Amino acid sequence: MTPNTSPGSTLPRAQVLAERAFSTLEKFLHIEAFSGVVLLLAAAAALIWANSPYADGYHHFWHTAVSFSIGSWSVSESLHFLINDGLMTIFFLVVGMEIRREIHEGALANMRLAALPLAAALGGVVVPALIYFILNPGGEAAHGWAVPTATDIAFAVGVLALLGRSIPSNVRVFLLALAIIDDIVAVLIIAVFYSGGMDYSGFIIAAVGILMVLGMQRIGIASAYPYVIPGAVLWFGLLKTGAHPTLAGVVLGLMTPVFAPHARTHPLELASKALKDLWNQTANSTPDPHHLAHPLKQLRRAQRDLLPPVSRVQMALHPYVAFGIMPLFALANAGVSLDGIDMSATGSMSVMLGVLIALVAGKPLGIIGASFLMVRMGWCALPPGVTWGGVCLVGLLAGIGFTMSIFIATLAFNDPNLLGAAKLGILLASLSAAVLGLAWGFFQAKRKQPAVA
């Protein structure tokens, strides 16, 4: 050991290196574009896996049963179900909270602004359905008219994230609001046209969950953890109705308070006292960990009380959603097998082209057209910072139908050839919409950059 090296000096150096490593990791985790890259890599891995010699392993893995039991009660669901209907509820919770914040003080703060995503979403449903029906007017092929009406919100947001900070935040909010409305319309279409109806008793259970949330908010429960219980009740109620249970996340997100809870002691005063206690404790060369615990706890409480719940929970969940849940969702759902698709079968080509054209051209036409009409008539206004170029970007990205479109296709077609053709059309359309959206987004960002002399 050299004279300048001692255990005491080695520890601070190791601590500095660790802090730098965690700081670098934290920067990566908060780069929007990096989360988009991770999502696309997961999707590419799934697509390659599903079309490799190990394709059977891919499908068997995601359909592995996961069981949970207490005494005589037990439940068993596939891994695929737990991701799509369980973990994705957290994704929709974050989306719902982002929209809640914007309704309070942002891009959706008044009716003229909030009505635009609704009109755009309806245009993005009607026009693709009409285009598909024109190309497939009869027979079983006509049953797939709803396939191109859907938008895969997770992939659309993931591709938008690749554009990073170059795109105004209100464009993202517009896309989120539109995609959620699109999702709700898709659920209604499935319930009315592709199922035996809804079990309305589930709405009573869902209502109980909502009332539990309102009651807990009323008595001032600030911690997020207790709300898991009424959230689970709401989720189960929606599952029982036949609707997509992940919508429970949207409902909870929209119910999240936008104001910090009223505390007896002002959070800044509490934080100041806690920091003073910490300073006094760490003045000793060897502070007692037991004495540090209380001021650290008070500091965390001050942080909790200072931030509105909608911001606090969203910030806490964002890294887990962006780098955990969304890549898992992509890995579990992007594995579309192209093996055995017979495009020479009757109706296959028209189904594939109908889906492809309706998603790539119909979605943007419907969204841009409805938005232009509403703004031109004076019924709506573009959100602050959103130009017509931004509306075009949202229209293009909304053409990423992917998982929701595939789900509707499996309900619409009994013929395996038509189903295979629809899946191929969805895959080609989603890839095309993503590429066109990225190209248009980079073009828009470049136009904003000042010319270098």
Swiss-Prot record:
UniProt membrane topology term: Multi-pass membrane protein
Functional note: Na(+)/H(+) antiporter that extrudes sodium in exchange for external protons.
Gene Ontology MF annotations: sodium:proton antiporter activity
PANTHER family given in the database record: NA(+)_H(+) ANTIPORTER NHAA, SODIUM ION/PROTON ANTIPORTER NHAA-RELATED
Native organism: Janthinobacterium sp. (strain Marseille)
Gene3D superfamilies tied to this protein: Na+/H+ antiporter like domain (1.20.1530.10)
Family recorded in the similarity comment: Belongs to the NhaA Na(+)/H(+) (TC 2.A.33) antiporter family.
Record's keyword terms, sorted: Antiport, Cell inner membrane, Cell membrane, Ion transport, Membrane, Sodium, Sodium transport, Transmembrane, Transmembrane helix, Transport
Protein name as annotated: Na(+)/H(+) antiporter NhaA
Regions crossing the membrane: 28-48, 79-99, 115-135, 144-164, 173-193, 196-216, 241-261, 321-341, 355-375, 393-413, 424-444
Family matches, as Pfam families: Na_H_antiport_1
Disulfide bonds: none
